[in-house]
Each structure stands twice: as structure tokens, then as C-alpha cells.
Amino acid sequence: MDPQAQFCHNPECPARGQLGRRNIRVHSRKERRYRCITCGRTFAATHDTPFYRLKKPTELVLIVLTLLCHGCPLQAIVAAFGLDERTIAAWRTRAGRHGQQFHEHHVLGGQVQLGHVQADELYVKAVVRRFWMAMAMAVPSRLWLGGVVSARRDLSLITTLVQMVRRAAKSMAFLVCVDGLASYVTAFARVFRDPVHTGKAGRPRLAAIPGLLLGQLIKHHRGRYLVEVTRRVVLGTAEAITAVLAATGTGTGINTSYIERLNATFRSALNPLVRRGRAIVHGEGVLTGWMYLVGCAYNFCWNHDSLRVAAPPGERLKWRDQTPAMAAGLTDHQWTMGELLSCPIPLPPWVAPKRRRRLPKRFQDPQPVPTSARFPVVLPLKESLKAFSLDREIGLSSQKSMASFG
């Protein structure tokens, strides 16, 4: 147990989610619990991970989730390990939720040099309906940038995907290659623009971000056969697009071959995506979590053959393998499934709550009584009461005298 690698999970703690503050101590090695000396709360070592409060051995859960990431049918896992389908589904849901948080924290942090991005969508068969799953990738590093699942292939689906691409981008100057879907042009034009502040009243005008290149590969079919391919330059020039393709080594013309190859990887890893298969997905949330689980394993745990580099002289092996996350500079080693699923996601920094009302009078500081030229001196309380009673007596006596005179 390493307390220096842990952080406080208490949402009300001022030191929540912060590493290196030396506020974590070992509370119980037998129960694997830590304690925060800032707030005094204890928490388990598996808190905020898929293994939290599970009764089954961690090794068994890792094996089952690894098989699910490699396209193993659910019924095969049930027959091999004697588990219930609902148990496996619950583990998959936990791991998918953790994978989505992990992806948003490590990939969508604006640290990736994209260079060349490709996006595409594919349909998934479900119970009584089908879903559309749109995904994007950074071609030079083969990094999966994220995906969105929706029942409709519309502008909302593509806009959400494009927003994820912008969150991951470190520089806004890169090339985007997509298919002929018109929603891509509208989504990239809306998302990749910034307000131009002129100092005048009113909402500032939104201007397109310079440096973004967009090309479309439009395929014309006749029946089930591809008869013609049209390459269209939407943003930028053909010379600029060719220069980016040559610099990144990702082709000589506008293409979507890399994202289509990634689609094939996901089809082999997600059982419901197999063509002409019998497996179907039961809900949009299940597919989203499963997609993020496979995507995180692809980025951080799986070596990519096209990313290997020559090993330094003197090493036993000729090549050094890399994962997409290593090629993108997000990590320096290949993660295991245990590391991926055991990595908790830190909470955002604690912010002191704002007081929305005045303090009670017993907690307020006494305020000085303001003086004026007409009343320069404020009498003490007793003197004020005496003066008030004297003025009242004078007023009553004058009223009596006036009544007697009348």
C-alpha cells in the first residue's frame, strides 16, 4: 500500500483529488483502507474503481473484462466460469463507466497533437431498433479520440463528436478527413470558431479558427457496388491538405481508410458489432460503456503494429512496441488491464462554498453608528433614553398647558 499514490475521495475535503500533499495515511493494511488527516475520513483502496465492494476475486473480474474487450461471447464466459449473466453485465457497466471517466480525464485534456483526424460512423443492431456509433481518431498516433452513441444519425450526434475532438486538441491547426455526410461540415464550422471581442455592446461575433483543414471523400454507389469516388476540399486548399498528408505520412489524397480500419478493430472487439452475428445490444447505455471500455484498452493496453519504433543499439529486441497513448505522449509505458481499471479518477479541486445570505446577528461584527453635521455626537444608550423621556415630559406638559388655556 502506497499512501503517496492516493488522494482523498471525500467531496467536502479541501484536499480532495490532490496528489503529493502528504495528507493520506494507512488506516488498515488488513482491510486495505486509507485515512485522510485533513478531513479524518477513511476510504478503501478500491474506492472509485470497478472493484469497489465486489465479493469476487479481483483476478476473476480482470479475466472476464479482458475477454469482453476481445470479443468473447457472453455465453462463453458464463459457461467457462459459472457466473450469472447479470453479474457479468454489472461488471461491464462498472468498467464502462470507469472507462468513460478515465478517457475524459486522460485523453480529452487538450494535450494531443492531432495533425490528421478522421471520423466515421457505423450502425449497431439492438433490440427492436439500431443505434449509430460515431467515432474519431488521430491518425499519426492512431489514438482513439472518443465516440458517441445515438439512435439517430443527425447533426446532434456529429456535433457532440466534434466537441470531443476539440477538447482533445492541443493545437487547432490540423486536417480532418470525413465521408460525404453533410453534418460534418456544419458541425466543424460551428464548433471550431471563437468569439471576436471588439469592446462594443452585444454578443461578440464568432469567427472561424484559422488553420483548420477539412476534406470530404464522397463515395457513389450503384446498388451494392462502388462506382465512383469524389474528393472535395471544404476548408483550406488542396495544396495545404497534400502537405499535411505528406508530413504525417498518412496518404497522398483525402481518405478515410484509417478510421475504417479502426471500425474493423472495434467490430472484432465488441461482439454486437459483428456483421451477420446473433449478438445484439440491450440499450444505448450498455453500448456506450462497452465502447469506452474497449477504447481505453485500445489506447493504453494494446500495442499497435504500425507504431513500433527501432530499438536503441544494444537491446535484445530489434523493435520497441508502442500503444497509441505512448505515441501521443500521454504515457511512457504500456498499461495492463489491472492498472487501467485500478486507476481512480481525481475529483476537481475543492472550492469554498459561497455564502448566499447574511450571517446571523450574533456572528456579525458591531457596526459604528454613522454621524452627521446635525447630530455630531451619538449619546450612549442611557443618556439617549433620558433625553427621550425628558422631551416627552416637556411635550406632555405643553399640551396640558395649552388645553387649560383653551
Where are these regions (language model features)?
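Residue-level recognition of single "structural anchor" positions
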Residues: 1-406
